[in-house]
Structures are given as C-alpha cells and as structure tokens.
C-alpha cells in the first residue's frame, strides 16, 4: 500500500533514484495505491545527466510493494521494497530498461511495455 509521503525506489533508468508519492490517481479521495496503480511523485534524488531531474513532478506506476497483493488462487506476492517506474502521459515508460522483478498484475492494467522490458515477471 502506497500513500502520500511514501518514498519509493525507482526500477528503471530514467535518471531518478528515489520518488515520493504526492497523490494517488483514480477516484475522488482515494488514499492508497497498490501494484499497477498510477501515482504522482516528486523526484527526491536523481543521477546527473538523467532524463528526470531532482524536484521534478512525474507520474509513475507502482511495480513492487512490501505489503504485496492477493491473487485469485489465494496466494500472496510480496516484495522487499516499494518500487515504481516513471511513465509518460501515454502510459509508456520514460526509461529504456527495467530493473528487478515486476508483478504479473501489470498485465491486467495494460502496462505491456513494462512487462516486455522487465527481466522477470512474477
């Protein structure tokens, strides 16, 4: 579960290293986001020379959460960190590489480009 003020690692090579959630998109008064949800973030740290700069406000999709998600077969999938991928307005990723595993739930939310770039889909 990601809420406002939550800090997330960045799972792509867009240039950002750490994000802070400032808004959860989708519905009025929505408090939390889970895997596959789009959030608005502020870039808290970035690598020099990257596409994304520190202080910039970007959209991102959550790809890993510590709280995890329940699958229809009753199993739970959890990760060691909260991570997101920076996206453009057309839902395509800003970076050209994805680092670490991503959850299969992204396929249901139509983030096929992220699924195809990811080294492992769990």
Curated annotation (Swiss-Prot):
It comes from the Bacteria. The keyword Endoplasmic reticulum does not apply. One of its GO terms (molecular function) is large ribosomal subunit rRNA binding. Keywords: Ribonucleoprotein, Ribosomal protein, RNA-binding, rRNA-binding. InterPro entries: Ribosomal_uL14 (IPR000218), Ribosomal_uL14_bac-type (IPR005745), Ribosomal_uL14_CS (IPR019972), Ribosomal_uL14_sf (IPR036853). The keyword Ribosomal protein applies. One of its GO terms (cellular component) is cytosolic large ribosomal subunit. CDD domains: Ribosomal_uL14. Disulfide bonds: none annotated. One of its GO terms (biological process) is translation. HAMAP family: Ribosomal_uL14 (MF_01367). Part of the 50S ribosomal subunit. Forms a cluster with proteins L3 and L19. In the 70S ribosome, L14 and L19 interact and together make contacts with the 16S rRNA in bridges B5 and B8. Belongs to the universal ribosomal protein uL14 family. Binds to 23S rRNA. Forms part of two intersubunit bridges in the 70S ribosome. PANTHER family: 50S/60S RIBOSOMAL PROTEIN L14/L23, LARGE RIBOSOMAL SUBUNIT PROTEIN UL14M. This is Large ribosomal subunit protein uL14. The lineage of its organism: Bacteria, Bacillati, Bacillota, Bacilli, Bacillales. The gene is rplN.
